[in-house]
Every structure is written in structure tokens, then in C-alpha cells.
């Protein structure tokens, strides 16, 4: 998608014109170099050394800043959300991938290469499914919404008697919905998902 066009459409949906906007903030998955304005690598979005700040400032004429999306979420929680008042905090985000943001003494921890909290690519199982990063068995492979959909489809293929067979489109909610209705296959999917999620959270705490 054209990020400048998407930004303009978002402003219009909010009832704003670009004249109403002082600056633009971009939260992106992957390694975002906030010093240079370059998205160095984002495996899920296909960005590779993309000069996002330069592009948006040229296209929209507004000061623009980038940050890893999980870092931005973590700082938001630290300032005004669940972590308000804490000295240090970790926020794990679950979506297309798995991300994390770490705040230490009020500052985002970026690491030496702006990838200091890429916990989604810590390995849960060395012989696990392939991750988009190139490794196998990453936390993200099991605990993202994408991973949950994959596990649900695999369980359904192995257990075609499951009531989930009637679902037209498998989503991240499917296994949870059918588990509540008493489906044994769905319950196993959810149990496995929680097991992997717990392992990933525990690893993050131990870092």
C-alpha cells in the first residue's frame, strides 16, 4: 500500500485535513531505525532498508518519526496505560506476528541495532515450523494470530470430524469460539496455543 495515501485516508476518516496535523508518527513491525528514519527490515511487511521518514516527509510535507510498533505500544502503556507508574515495563503484542517493547527507567530499550526486543524470533522449538525470518520454531510461529490460524487448520485436517469443519473461514477466533461450544479439537488447539504463549512470555521475563 502507498503509505502517504493511507495516511491521507486515515486523516479523512478522522474528519481531519493534512493542515490539521502537525506531525506523523509511524509504528512498524521489525527493525525501525528511529535515528535515520529507515525501516531496516520488516519480514511481515516486506520492507528492507526503506527510507520511510524521507518518503513521507517529501510526500506529505510533515515532520515524521518512526518507531517499532511494539516499542510505541509499550511506551503508550508506560505513559498512560497498564504500566503507568511502573519503573520498568515489557509489553508483548500479538497480531500478524509477535512483538515486544521494553521500557527501562522511562526510556525505550532499542538495543545496539534497534532490534533489542524482537522476542517474537526467540526460538521455542528448534524443529518447529518455518518462520518468515528464516529460523524454525520461533515464538511468533506459535503465538501470533497467523500461527494460531495455521495450528487450527492443521488440527482440523487431522480431525475432520471437528465441528470447525463447518466454518467457512478459519480465523484466530475460530478455535476459541468452538472450544467454548465444547469441541475437543478446538480445545486442544487452544491448550497448545496457551502452552507456547506461556513459554514465550516466560522466556521474555527471563531475559
Name every feature range the model reports, one short phrase each:
Residues 25-29, 91-97, 101-103:
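Short beta-strand segments
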Residues 30-34, 72-74, 99:
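Short, active-site-adjacent cap segments at secondary-structure transitions
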Residues 40, 109-110:
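Generic structural signal for well-ordered beta-strand positions
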Residues 48-49:
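Short catalytic helix/loop segments, enriched in acidic residues and glycine
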Residues 115-118:
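Structural signature of FAD isoalloxazine-binding scaffolds in flavoprotein oxidoreductases
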Amino acid at each position: 500500500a502507498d503509505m502517504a495515501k493511507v495516511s491521507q485516508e486515515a486523516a479523512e476518516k478522522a474528519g481531519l485535513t493534512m493542515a490539521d496535523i502537525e506531525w506523523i508518527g509511524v509504528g512498524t513491525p521489525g527493525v525501525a531505525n528511529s535515528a535515520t528514519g529507515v525501516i531496516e527490515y520488516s519480514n511481515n511487511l516486506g520492507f528492507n532498508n526503506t527510507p520511510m521518514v524521507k518518503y513521507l516527509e517529501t510526500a506529505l510535507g510533515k515532520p515524521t518519526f518512526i518507531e517499532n510498533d511494539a516499542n510505541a505500544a509499550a511506551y503508550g502503556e508506560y505513559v498512560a496505560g497498564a504500566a503507568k507508574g511502573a519503573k520498568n515495563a515489557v509489553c508483548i503484542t500479538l497480531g500478524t506476528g509477535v512483538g515486544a517493547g521494553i521500557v527501562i527507567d522511562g526510556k525505550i530499550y532499542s538495543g545496539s541495532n534497534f532490534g533489542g526486543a524482537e522476542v517474537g524470533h526467540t526460538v521455542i522449538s528448534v524443529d518447529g515450523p518455518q518462520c518468515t525470518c528464516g529460523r524454525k520454531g520461533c515464538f511468533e510461529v506459535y503465538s501470533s494470530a497467523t500461527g494460531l490460524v495455521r495450528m487450527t487448520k492443521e488440527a482440523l485436517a487431522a480431525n475432520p470430524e471437528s465441528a470447525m469443519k463447518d466454518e467457512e473461514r478459519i480465523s484466530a477466533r475460530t478455535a476459541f469460539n468452538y472450544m467454548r461450544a465444547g469441541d475437543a479439537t478446538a480445545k486442544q488447539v487452544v491448550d497448545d496455543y496457551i502452552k507456547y504463549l506461556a513459554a514465550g512470555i516466560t522466556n521474555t521475563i527471563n531475559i
